[in-house]
């Protein structure tokens, strides 16, 4: 649904008669609600069957995606985005926790990279499908609604598939590595309280600088896709379908970069763990460089080439996040740790970054807004992550 909001943003804006600031603010608002919901979902994940919690949340998300297609004003759109944020909030703390418990330590970077491929695959296929649905529906002012109705159907199928997954043993591979076997259930400790977990996580310096760096990056990360879509509509007069396939193409290089980064990350982690985190920081900074260069070109081919390179760097960078957090955070606090990533991305950076970018966009245009917001967010975020890599071995 986030891809649909990105591609169909100009159509939604025209249909509901809202400004760039309002559109980006509502998108960011969904991120804020998502963030706030990650913390209770992390609490639930530590106490109940994680696949069950995730399947229920996915069902809520599917229902609110369909509701988004029926909204008639900005207030209703805010409710829809908030609801999808709640539903999607479960994925941030629960999915990485399940992956870390399901697969051995030595191959986690590759597994997280394989999981991360879902995003660029969705970014490649989703915009094309969203734009195509609107085109087939008639390309009218309200035909964007059809896309949201149809996108809720596969989400409902996913609910059943998730519920049927087997729940992995928590920390099994860490127990095996340290103790030579799994702990008996009677010996297991109770779940760590959220307040205690957050206090302990603040002392894991590599994790602290990682999430702060991601939070700074969030000022650009959340607002860029929708702003680029608005740029394509405003400056180039592209309709939903053309915007869709251009945004699809912009994620094609990430399909190559992500598996390569996952394999390279495993290799670097075995050599020296801090090198893998340093790689993430470098790729975050390069994302900012490529996107900024790209939006300064008026030639659409050059713009999309550099934007595509930026997306490839962004996708590759996040392959190192899951393995890093899994390595430095005790397995009983993984869900809480991953929930904090969402807090920093959307609450610290995403919400305010969306409002800031929208305000600059309304005042000076999308191209100038991106030029102002992206460079400091990506460069400072990348440097913070690289600085945090020095604490990897200690942590």
PLM region spans:
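Extracytoplasmic gate region of multi-pass secondary transporters
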Residues: 5-6, 204-259, 318, 322, ...
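Helix-loop-helix hairpin linking two adjacent transmembrane segments in secondary transporters
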Residues: 115-170
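Cytoplasmic helix-loop-helix junction between adjacent transmembrane helices
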Residues: 80-120
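Central cavity-lining transmembrane alpha-helices of secondary-active solute carriers
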Residues: 28-42, 248-261
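Conserved MFS/SLC helix-loop-helix module at the cytosolic interface between two early adjacent transmembrane helices
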Residues: 36-75
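Juxtamembrane intracellular "pre-TM" segments in multi-pass secondary transporters
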Residues: 169-211
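Structural signature of the two symmetry-related core transmembrane helices
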Residues: 52-66, 275-291
């Amino acid at each position: 649904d986030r891809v649909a909001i990105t591609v169909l943003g100009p159509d939604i804006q025209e249909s509901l008669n809202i400004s760039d600031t309002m559109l980006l603010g509502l998108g960011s608002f969904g991120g804020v609600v998502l963030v706030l919901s990650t913390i209770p979902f992390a609490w639930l994940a530590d106490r109940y069957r994680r696949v069950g919690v995730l399947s229920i949340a996915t069902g809520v998300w599917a229902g609110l995606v369909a509701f988004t297609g029926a909204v008639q004003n900005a207030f209703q759109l805010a409710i829809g985005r908030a609801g999808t944020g709640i539903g999607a909030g479960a994925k941030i703390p629960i999915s990485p926790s399940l992956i870390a418990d399901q697969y051995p330590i030595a191959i986690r970077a590759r597994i997280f990279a394989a999981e991360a491929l879902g995003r660029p695959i969705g970014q490649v296929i989703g915009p094309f499908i969203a734009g195509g649905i609107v085109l087939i529906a008639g390309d009218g002012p309200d035909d964007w609604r059809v896309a949201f109705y149809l996108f809720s159907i596969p989400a409902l199928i996913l609910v059943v598939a998730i519920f049927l997954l087997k729940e992995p043993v928590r920390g099994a591979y860490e127990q095996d590595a340290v103790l030579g076997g799994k702990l008996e259930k009677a010996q297991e400790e109770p779940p760590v309280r959220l307040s205690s977990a957050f206090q302990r996580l603040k002392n894991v310096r590599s994790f602290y600088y990682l999430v702060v760096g991601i939070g700074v990056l969030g000022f650009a990360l959340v607002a860029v896709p929708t702003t680029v879509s608005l740029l394509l509509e405003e400056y180039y007069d592209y309709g939903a379908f053309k915007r869709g396939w251009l945004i699809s193409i912009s994620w094609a290089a990430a399909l190559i970069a992500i598996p390569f980064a996952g394999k390279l990350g495993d290799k670097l982690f075995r050599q020296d763990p801090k090198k893998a985190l340093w790689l993430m920081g470098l790729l975050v900074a390069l994302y900012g460089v490529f996107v900024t260069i790209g939006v300064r070109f008026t030639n659409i081919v050059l713009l999309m080439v550099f934007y595509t390179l930026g997306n490839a760097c962004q996708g590759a960078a996040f392959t190192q996040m899951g393995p890093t957090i899994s390595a430095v955070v005790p397995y009983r606090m993984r869900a809480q740790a991953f929930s904090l990533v969402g807090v920093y991305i959307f609450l610290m950076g995403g919400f305010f970054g969306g409002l800031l970018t929208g305000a600059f966009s309304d005042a000076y245009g999308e191209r100038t807004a991106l030029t102002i917001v992206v460079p400091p967010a990506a460069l400072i975020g990348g440097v913070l992550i690289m600085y945090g890599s020095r604490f990897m071995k200690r942590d």
